């Protein structure tokens, strides 16, 4: 029952994220990412079905993988367009569809894909056929190729672009570890299978991606802004990553941040000195109590009557 609850929760999280990206942000460059999140959500929901009693385990085990068969193509398309700022070539789309996606869908309900499946000790077990292994290998290759593309793009980018790439690469690696470990490695080693953890792990991966994609990209946050919002845990993480991956941009952003602070303090001090009846010490105290002089315009003290 715990597995079902976790899978359904993962499904809801992915679906919400996917629908938000597609229907709220409506940015074409993130369309593949949004569709990928929705497929993760459907995958997680379908993964829960075989755990219910009196279900056709072999049928649902084959069915639950269907949303993920096209996922490698979407991943490659998204990473390529994200890094190089241009659409994935039509020829590349056709090759992946003809060589990978269509053959697997064609044999997805045959013994060449999954031969048998059963629930034992609250875990889903199945016997994989040659096309299932082909499916997993293709997924792993798409992840590896995406990481290579990110590395190439990382070298050419600066500032928060590098921070974004770190989040996306971390999410992809987490995806690789989750799927590779819980759907492939444990099975080949003959160890107890916990393959229901794979979609849960992928949910964490998309959450990591969303920090770099939604939290930064969709709101176009600059290096300076993450310094100004350093009380946020995500902003703290962004600052640490930026400091490591691009020290030059970090120093420039820090310089601009300090310059802005000094300018605001001087402006606030001057305004209070002219428009209020406070002494110098009272102005210092007031600025100190208001976050180092960052006073919203409407909170200025009026001159005493």
Predicted regions and their residues:
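Individual alpha-helical transmembrane segments in multi-pass integral membrane proteins
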Residues: 1-14, 26-108, 133-140, 194-203
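Alpha-helical transmembrane segments
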Residues: 17-20, 77, 147-149, 208-216
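Alpha-helical transmembrane segments of multi-pass integral membrane proteins
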Residues: 19-46, 130-185
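Juxtamembrane "helix-exit" motif on the non-cytosolic side of transmembrane helices
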Residues: 46-56, 108-122, 180-190
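Juxtamembrane/interfacial segments around transmembrane helices
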Residues: 57-64, 86-94, 117-125, 145-153, ...
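Membrane-proximal helix-loop-helix units in multi-pass membrane proteins
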Residues: 102-144
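Interfacial "cap-and-anchor" motif at the non-cytosolic start of specific transmembrane alpha-helices
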Residues: 160-239
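Membrane-proximal linker segments that couple transmembrane helices to downstream signaling/catalytic modules
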Residues: 214-305
């Amino acid at each position: 029952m715990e597995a079902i609850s976790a899978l359904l929760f993962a499904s809801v999280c992915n679906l919400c994220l996917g629908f938000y990206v597609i229907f709220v942000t409506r940015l074409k460059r993130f369309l593949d990412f949004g569709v990928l999140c929705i497929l993760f959500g459907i995958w997680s929901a379908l993964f829960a079905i075989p755990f219910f009693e009196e279900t056709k385990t072999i049928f649902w085990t084959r069915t639950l993988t269907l949303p993920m068969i096209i996922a490698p193509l979407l991943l490659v398309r998204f990473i390529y367009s994200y890094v190089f700022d241009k659409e994935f070539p039509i020829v590349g789309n056709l090759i992946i569809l003809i060589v990978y996606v269509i053959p697997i869908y064609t044999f997805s309900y045959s013994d060449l894909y999954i031969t048998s499946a059963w629930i034992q000790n609250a875990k889903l077990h199945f016997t994989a056929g040659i096309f299932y292994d082909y499916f997993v290998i293709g997924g792993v290759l798409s992840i590896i190729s995406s990481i290579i593309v990110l590395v190439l793009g990382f070298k050419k980018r600066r500032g928060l672009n590098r921070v974004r790439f770190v989040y996306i690469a971390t999410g992809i690696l987490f995806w690789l570890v989750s799927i590779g470990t819980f759907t492939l490695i444990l099975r080949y080693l003959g160890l107890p299978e916990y393959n229901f953890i794979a979609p849960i792990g992928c949910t964490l991966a998309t959450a990591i991606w969303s920090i770099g994609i939604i939290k930064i990209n969709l709101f176009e946050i600059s290096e300076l802004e993450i310094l100004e919002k350093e009380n946020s845990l995500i902003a703290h993480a962004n600052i640490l990553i930026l400091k490591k991956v691009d020290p030059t941009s970090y120093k420039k952003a820090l310089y601009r941040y300090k310059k802005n602070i000094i300018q605001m303090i001087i402006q606030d001090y001057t305004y209070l000195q002219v428009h209020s009846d406070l002494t110098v010490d009272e102005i210092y105290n007031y600025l100190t109590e208001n976050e180092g002089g960052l006073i919203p315009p409407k909170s200025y003290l009026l001159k005493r009557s």
